[in-house]
Amino acid sequence: MQCALYDAGRCRSCQWITQPIPEQLSAKTADLKNLLADFPVEEWCAPVSGPEQGFRNKAKMVVSGSVEKPLLGMLHRDGTPEDLCDCPLYPASFAPVFAALKPFIARAGLTPYNVARKRGELKYILLTESQSDGGMMLRFVLRSETKLAQLRKALPWLQEQLPQLKVITVNIQPVHMAIMEGETEIYLTEQQALAERFNDVPLWIRPQSFFQTNPAVASQLYATARDWVRQLPVKHMWDLFCGVGGFGLHCATPDMQLTGIEIASEAIACAKQSAAELGLTRLQFQALDSTQFATAQGEVPELVLVNPPRRGIGKPLCDYLSTMAPRFIIYSSCNAQTMAKDVRELPGYRIERVQLFDMFPHTAHYEVLTLLVKQ
C-alpha cells in the first residue's frame, strides 16, 4: 500500500506498511504458532485477509488547528498536529465528508480543543459508515454544551451537503485526558442507530456500542464462527462479551437457545433489535458483566463463545469454565497473547481448530478464532 503520509515520515501508525501482505500474514501466523507452541493444534486453517486499503468503516479524528482552518487527524507526541484526511485506510467515501466538515466547523464556531492550553470545545470527530447502504454516523465530541445551540443552528447546511449522514450526535467529554468519549450522548437526528448487514444478518451500530472496524474481514469471521457452530451438536449456547450480537446472531438457529451478555447497554439495544428483526424468539440479550453472569450460573450450555477485550477472559472465568466444563468453547480474540494465557488456564481442553483473521493490515495485530473441545 502506498501512503504519502508514511513516505514523508508524518505518520507511523502502519508500522508494517513496507512489507507485502503475504509476508505480513506469514509473520502473524508465526507469532500465533509461537504463542500456541505448548498446545497441540489439530487443524490450522488458512488465514483470512481482506482489502489492503480503504477497508476501515470508522475514522477517529483529533480536531486541532484553528476554527477557521481546522485539522482532522492526530497529535504527535510533542503536540504538533497532523492532518490524516488522506489516510489510505479510509474509503473514498470519507473524503467528501472531511471536506465538508472543515467549513462546517468554522460556520458553527466550534473552536478546536487546545490540549496545551486546556481551552476550546471540539475535541474529536468520529465517523462510521455502513457497508450495506452507505449511511453514516457522525459524532462531535465536545468539552461542554456551550456550543451546542450554535451547532444545532448550523446543522441543516451540513445535512444538505451530506445527505448520507443518517445519525448525528454530540458527545460530551469534559475531562482533560486522552479519553475518546464521555457518558453523555445528545442526538441531533431522529434516527439513533446505523443499519448494517453482514451475511444477510441485520446488525445495528449505536454511538456508544463497539463495532469491528474492518467489515470485509469481520463478516468472514462471523460466517466462520457460524459454520463451526453448525458442525457441533449444540442446542444451547452463551455468547459472552457479545457486543452488538454479531457472533450470536450468526450462530443462532430458530430452535437454539442463546444468551448473549455484554456490559454496554447501547450494544445490547442493537442486539435485541436485530434478534427481533430475525424473528429469533429464543435469543436473550442482557446488559451485564460477562464474568459475573457466568459464574453465578449453576449449569452451562454445550457451547460457550467468548469474544473478550484485549485483556482476555481472565482467571475467574477460566476457573469457572474449567469446573463447569462445557463441551465446547469458541474463543475469538484480538490479542493472541492473552488468549494463550487463558487457554493455559483451561487444562481440560484441547485445541481442535485455529484460524487467523487479518483484521488490522500493516500492523502486528490480528484477530484469531479458536475451537476448544473438552477432553
From Swiss-Prot:
Q: Which Pfam families match?
A: tRNA_U5-meth_tr
Under which name does UniProt file this protein? 23S rRNA (uracil(747)-C(5))-methyltransferase RlmC
Record field: catalytic activity:
uridine(747) in 23S rRNA + S-adenosyl-L-methionine = 5-methyluridine(747) in 23S rRNA + S-adenosyl-L-homocysteine + H(+)
Q: What class of enzyme is it?
A: transferase
Briefly state the protein's biological role.
Answer: Catalyzes the formation of 5-methyl-uridine at position 747 (m5U747) in 23S rRNA.
NCBIfam families in the record: meth_trns_rumB (TIGR02085)
| GO biological process, any | rRNA base methylation
Record-listed [4Fe-4S] cluster binding positions:
C3, C11, C14, C87
What EC number(s) does its UniProt record assign? Answer: 2.1.1.189
Keywords linked to the UniProt accession: 4Fe-4S, Iron, Iron-sulfur, Metal-binding, Methyltransferase, rRNA processing, S-adenosyl-L-methionine, Transferase
- Family designation: Belongs to the class I-like SAM-binding methyltransferase superfamily. RNA M5U methyltransferase family. RlmC subfamily.
List of catalytic residues:
C334 (nucleophile)
Residues that bind S-adenosyl-L-methionine? Q212, F241, E262, N307
Q: Which GO terms describe its molecular function?
A: 4 iron, 4 sulfur cluster binding; iron ion binding; rRNA (uridine-C5-)-methyltransferase activity
